[in-house]
Swiss-Prot record:
It holds the Pfam family SelO. One of its GO terms (molecular function) is AMPylase activity. The gene is ydiU. PANTHER family: PROTEIN ADENYLYLTRANSFERASE SELO, MITOCHONDRIAL. This is Protein nucleotidyltransferase YdiU. It is an enzyme of class 2 (transferase).
Length: 496
């Protein structure tokens, strides 16, 4: 695929590049350069991600970097490529997919750098290879928000806009997000080679992932020297821990297809996601998900289903189905334990133990049922509860409920439980566990509308708050307030 940058001098931005994925062989990818994005301009930049890459702030502010991250000038040392994968989408085999609008530049400092929205690839299918400003801002902000929350995630270095028109449901404008992760390998990469009976390539891919990210699988005693069963177990455990974090913070991914599942247990592919406003366990955030397959409360089971698909893909290497089943069982152990631990921390129960388990579980189950019945704002409840000690007026928490008697009864039981914990310690734990700020849909929408008018101040403000969501940030309380009535009318779909 020919692009206009092929004869330009490559720019050196001071990063040492390699591309170990490119060494796997041509079966895994197509080499190609990103398409130029006309007249690009900065929309948002993460200095935190830049530091992770070893990229100086002077480069992050430079017009030269703007050009290389939008395909207008090649970057010295990179080996750009688009990878092929397959997968299950909404429960059905979708066949060959692949990086339809993302180009992997390579890796630097152990981190892969990928440009999303960088033009057509052989895997674009019916797409145009571009991403729009709207979805790019959402991905940029949510990547950094999840990092701030301590949830495993891909990162975003920057989002760059252009006035180039892009047609979706309406005509929008183009953008490119620079994404960063140790690897962007998905369950779907394994499914692709397994489905096509390319077992040699499947083994090459599995060995690459094990040697680079899971070397302990080579010495697994549990699976009698079978590193592929050990890999499945390790991925299952990481995925379980990740989904537990999602459920605890109230994050709904929206499109948990197998090609959107990271082999490293990272949150990737931010599309029609949402942080819950009112606590509705059955909430469906993706307007395209008509049957509610990816509802909030279904995420744990869907993740297991996706892991089962990964297990099937790895079966030619694992050999025995019993070993694969045993490896998957770890998910059923790790997820509930991790979720319970996180929820006890949200309650400030730092002394939770077997002796308190019955009381603690009842407290947790009862408050979740009450929150759901009353449709209480999930983030605000937990943050207010964090400020509600034994000797503190609980009125701000009571005000969230219509059924005050039910709230009072629960708060009494809760305060009695906290009497066994040194005063102040529970609140300290809770304030570090229950964020004040999350990326609510309406906040993202306000930033997007301002950015369309070339006002990027809302993007900058949200980035600042979301990078440290547990801090109070005096003067910014409006960003932690209840969503306005119009927020419920926002519809987010797979269109991006």
């Amino acid at each position: 695929m020919t692009v206009a940058t092929q004869n330009l001098t490559a720019l050196d931005v001071g990063l040492a590049w390699r591309n170990s994925f490119a060494q796997l062989g041509k079966s895994f990818y197509t080499p190609l350069a990103p398409w130029p994005l006309p007249a690009p301009y900065w929309v948002g930049r993460s200095t935190s991600t830049a530091r992770e890459l070893g990229l100086s702030e002077s480069w992050l502010d430079s017009p030269e970097l703007l050009q290389v991250l939008t395909g207008n000038q090649p970057m010295a040392g990179t080996q750009p490529l688009a990878s092929v994968y397959s997968g299950h989408q909404f429960g059905q085999w979708a066949g060959q997919l692949g990086d339809g609008r993302a180009i992997l530049l390579g890796e630097t400092g152990g981190l892969e750098v990928q440009l999303k929205g960088s033009g057509l690839t052989p895997y674009s299918r019916m797409g145009d290879g571009r991403a729009v400003l709207r979805s790019s801002i959402r991905e940029f902000l949510c990547s950094e928000a999840m990092q701030g929350l301590g949830i495993a995630t891909s990162r975003a270095l920057c989002v760059v806009g252009s006035d180039a028109p892009i047609r979706r449901e309406t005509v929008e404008t183009a953008a490119v997000v620079t994404r960063v992760a140790p690897s962007f390998i998905r369950f779907g990469h394994f499914e692709h080679f397994s489905h096509h009976d390319q077992h040699a390539q499947l083994k090459v891919l599995a060995d690459y992932v094990i040697d680079r990210f899971y070397p302990e699988c080579r010495a697994s005693d549990k699976f009698a020297g079978n590193p592929y069963a050990a890999l499945l177990e390790a991925v299952s455990e990481r995925t379980a821990a990740l989904v537990a974090q999602w459920q605890a913070v109230g994050f709904c991914h929206g499109v948990l297809n197998t090609d959107n599942m990271s082999i490293l247990g990272l949150t990737i592919d931010y599309g029609p996601f949402q942080f819950l406003d009112a606590f509705n366990p059955g909430h469906v955030c993706n307007h395209s998900d008509q049957e509610g397959r990816y509802a909030f409360d279904k995420q744990p089971n869907i993740a297991y289903w996706n892991l089962f698909c990964l297990g099937q893909a790895l079966l030619p290497l694992i050999g025995e189905q019993e070993l694969a089943i045993a490896a998957l069982e770890s998910y059923k152990t790790v997820f509930p334990a991790a979720f319970e631990r996180l929820m006890f921390a949200k309650l400030g129960l730092l002394d939770a133990s077997d002796s308190t388990a019955t009381v603690d579980r009842a407290l947790l189950q009862d408050i979740l049922q009450l929150l759901a019945r009353e449709q209480v704002d999930y983030t605000i409840f937990w943050r207010r509860l964090s400020h509600c000690g034994v000797a503190t007026d609980a009125q701000t928490v009571r005000d969230l409920f219509v059924d005050r008697s039910a709230a009072d009864a629960w708060l009494l039981r809760y305060s009695e439980r906290l009497e066994h914990i040194p005063q102040g310690l529970a609140a300290d734990l809770m304030l570090k566990t229950n964020p004040k700020f999350v990326l609510r849909n309406y906040l993202g929408e306000q930033a997007i509308q301002a950015a369309k008018l070339k006002d990027f101040s809302q993007v900058e403000t949200l980035l600042m708050l979301l990078e440290s969501p547990f801090e109070e940030h005096p003067g910014f309380d409006k960003y932690a307030d209840f969503p306005p009535d119009w927020a419920s009318s926002i519809e987010i779909s797979c269109s991006s």
